Amino acid sequence: MEDVIAPISKELLKAELTEEKRLRMTNRSHNQIYIITAQDSPNTMKEIGRLREIAFRAAGGGTGKSMDIDEYDIMDNPYKQLIVWNPEAEEILGGYRYILGTDVRFDEHGAPILATAHMFNFSDKFLKDYLPTTIELGRSFVTLEYQSTRADSKGLFALDNLWDGLGALTVVMPNVKYFFGKVTMYPSYHRQSRDKILYFLRKHFADKDNLITPMKPLLLESDENELAALFCKDSFKEDYKILNCEIRKAGYNIPPLVNAYMLSLIHISEPT
């Protein structure tokens, strides 16, 4: 495993984070959201790669390289990087990378050039009817020092600040209707708890049209009849209470991104 690179100079970062790259201020903590690419901000890209590698290694993953930067970050038509910047501490709190569906290119076989293309099969219906109004998200991270264990409000709202950025994308790109991407659960996560989350998601968020299907489906190791008996309620909210209780009993938590995505879908679908 390679050593992670040293932090990039704050002066180099500030020189690249210019006004035209600033998307907006965050709703909380007075942080700033920027959009950059490896081409227009190479030093910032290196710092993102450094911070991603540190955060992912701490969670049981990581590339093992000195920076988490791949071909999708640096290709001719690169993914854009959405980052939250703390102007007081002059450091990056977290980020996502993304690509707009209308910017996606296709290879000689007609397959989309996407970071998730080696994991999923995309139906013709998805490519035709959904991709043009979709943003693919990936590589989400919160810098280690700003994760939820940090006591001050800057750390407390780091994830909220990222949501601000995603919301702002839909304002500046009003044709966008959907986000999609993968969520990583590392092998160290409790297997029975993982199965409960997976069963719950399949029950309440099934892709009935098979818009996107995994090349290697994740198989349940637990007895499916037992899971069906456990999650026997008619509503998401009642089953969710059971799920949350079961995961906590095992000494774990529902992964924050899984939790946030599920709850955001429910809030969107509920009438106001």
Predicted feature locations:
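Short, well-ordered loop/turn elements at secondary-structure boundaries
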Residues: 76-80, 88, 92-93, 130-132, ...
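Short amphipathic alpha-helix that is part of the acyltransferase structural core
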Residues: 25-70, 80-100
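A short helix-loop-beta-strand connector motif used in the catalytic cores of GNAT acetyltransferases and
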Residues: 72-83, 106, 269
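Conserved N-terminal entry element of GNAT/NAT acetyltransferase domains
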Residues: 2-39
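Acyl-donor binding region in acyl/amide transferases
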Residues: 103-265
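Generic detection of long, well-ordered alpha-helical segments
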Residues: 3, 7, 38-49, 156, ...
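Conserved small/polar residues in nucleotide/adenosyl-binding loops
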Residues: 266-272
